[in-house]
Design a protein with these regions (language model features):
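Catalytic cores of the polymerase beta-like nucleotidyltransferase superfamily
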Residues: 1-205
Length: 205
């Protein structure tokens, strides 16, 4: 894992598409963050093509506005049922979603979704290393938001859930499979509380 200053982190967002996203977000008055695996993989020095952007507001409105700004070379796909949209532009794909809160009923894997804040969105992430976010708005461009100690967990090579693991796994039992996959792929250790919860809840997969 590498450690980066904010100025060094900004260099990883120097491609023109990020500047266009930032300008679109500022024009719309929306907070906008790159989240999840793309941010994680910068610090782990792993290649990553999946760019996921969380908008505090409508991800679909953001994607449509970006598509108009980019012009004829952009292709926008809207998935209204999921509240998400994708913009393809010159070989780059960016997924947009509005920040949201999710809750699950015990007998269902279908989430109850409400609009939320960035913090709400990070709360619902599976693991701390995937809850990292980097702001794209001009005033805070390149600022890392790490509320759960994901950077420290990467340093310690640890897989840990942002919330009580029983809640995280109960919300979506398939996260237990992802936990094992990440630990295997990255050579990380599963935090004791997380592992014990995984053992307790394994029948739910």
């Amino acid at each position: 894992m590498i450690e980066l200053t904010q100025e060094e982190l900004k260099q990883h967002f120097s491609e023109p598409i990020f500047g266009q996203i930032a300008e679109t977000a500022d024009t719309l008055g929306m907070e906008c963050y790159v989240v999840g695996g793309y941010v994680r993989d910068i610090f782990l020095q792993r290649p990553s093509k999946d760019i996921d952007v969380v908008v505090v507001g409508s991800g679909i409105a953001m994607a449509e506005a970006l598509g108009k700004r980019l012009g004829r070379g952009a292709h926008v796909s809207v998935f209204k049922n999921f509240g998400t949209a994708q913009v393809k532009y010159r070989g780059t794909e960016v997924e947009f979603v509005g920040a949201r809160k999710e809750s699950y009923q015990r007998d269902s894997r279908k989430p109850i979704v409400e609009d939320g804040t960035l913090e709400d969105d990070q709360n619902r992430r599976d693991f701390t290393i995937n809850a990292l976010a980097v702001c794209l708005n001009k005033a805070r461009f390149g600022e890392l938001v790490d509320p759960f100690g994901g950077m420290e967990d990467m340093k310690e090579k640890t897989i840990r859930t942002p919330l009580d693991p029983d809640i995280t796994f109960s919300d979506d039992p398939l996260r237990m499979m992802r936990c094992i996959r990440f630990a295997t792929q990255l050579g990380f250790y599963i935090d004791d509380d997380t592992f014990e919860s995984l053992c307790r809840n394994k029948e739910r997969i």
